Amino acid sequence: MDTPARLNDLQRTTLAIVLAGGRGTRLGPLTNKRVKPAVHFGGKYRIIDFALSNCLNSGIRRIAVVTQYKAHSLLRHLQRGWSFLRGEMGEFIDLWPAQQRVEGAHWYRGTADAVFQNLDIIRSIRPKYVVVLAGDHIYKMDYTRMIADHAESGADCTVGCIEVPRMEAVAFGVMHVDANRRVTDFLEKPADPPCIPGRPDTALASMGIYVFSADYLYSLLEENISTIDTDHDFGKDILPRVVTQGTAIAHPFSMSCVSSDPNVEPYWRDVGTIDAYWAANLDLASTIPTLDLYDRNWPIWTYQEQLPPAKFVRDMKGLQGSGNNLIVCGGCVISGSQISRSVLSSNVKVSSFCNINEAVLLPQVTVGASCRLQKVVIDRGCAIPEGTVIGEDPVSDAERFYRTDDGVVLVTPEALRQKV
């Protein structure tokens, strides 16, 4: 039985490791300067804030963040916004950049190697359970429920899972489970994903969330590092090994998701493409968004820069603009323009006579007068020249910017020949 004392013990004996070193190549130019978990999301957040907030709200206050690729903006964000835990109480967010800590002098060669290279640090913390998390997904989850499920089952490893359309499962690890939720097979990013029996259009996908009994994890990593033919990856190497050698159980997301409406399907998004990133941002501007950011019982924490309030003013002719289904963050100034179904991040400035629809504007973007922007993502610091039109002519958009097959246009300072 999960009594408060029992849950508190699970929290105190758990170490969470957030993997935040991946580039996120499917996001194209958006990750040319920053690692994917550091990408801005929802106006005021970074993607990694969701995994870290889940840890904090779950009562897990011993956290490590593993970094490698272009980590400066991520490290700066963590140092400014996540340094409030009390070290004297045994709480911490440790930063583990690649340091060539083991023999061979190599950087992190995969997700499993990233954890292995810090094994001496992990052992010194002496956790009973280790939660390994991807730092690049958007969701709200009580990890303590998953840890309790792991402890009660007696499994060596517990894998968070969610049902997805079968053809979307090519981007995930896919598993088979028996009637007792035991994982019987695990395939990492299969070209032809197997379906859930009796449901030909649905697959059971890994969420990239694993709970390990600590001693078992140590032995797995030490075995893997001595293996020649390996990618040193949790999905490709570690999980298949657990399935054949030990006991892995599946933990459905529905068992531990956090939602203010139990009738709504559990929200989990891999915003790994420009289309998915754009759509997930715009969903937040809906009248009733799928992801509730206003749940005071499960806040999403972040670094909050001290900015003046957002301001809406009349245009240069004295006419009033309009806006609906908008997220507008601190420091924004909107001058008499028509804006709908969009996300305006911190310090965005929009001049007069603009028409903006279905746009995600990242921090410090300025939009000149008389611009028309449709179905766009504007990267941080871009200055959109007066009279610019984006999103109306697919050929012109593709010649100037990064345009997806679904028609979302990503505008970067480099594409505008600007230096930020």
Swiss-Prot record:
Coiled coil: none annotated. GO terms for biological process: glycogen biosynthetic process. InterPro entries: ADP-Glc_PPase (IPR011831), ADP_Glu_pyroP_CS (IPR005836), GlgC_bac (IPR023049), GlmU/GlgC-like_hexapep (IPR056818), NTP_transferase_dom (IPR005835), Nucleotide-diphossugar_trans (IPR029044), Trimer_LpxA-like_sf (IPR011004). Pathway: Glycan biosynthesis; glycogen biosynthesis. Its EC number is 2.7.7.27. HAMAP family: GlgC (MF_00624). Homotetramer. This is Glucose-1-phosphate adenylyltransferase. It comes from Paraburkholderia phytofirmans (strain DSM 17436 / LMG 22146 / PsJN) (Burkholderia phytofirmans). The lineage of its organism: Bacteria, Pseudomonadati, Pseudomonadota, Betaproteobacteria, Burkholderiales. The gene is glgC.
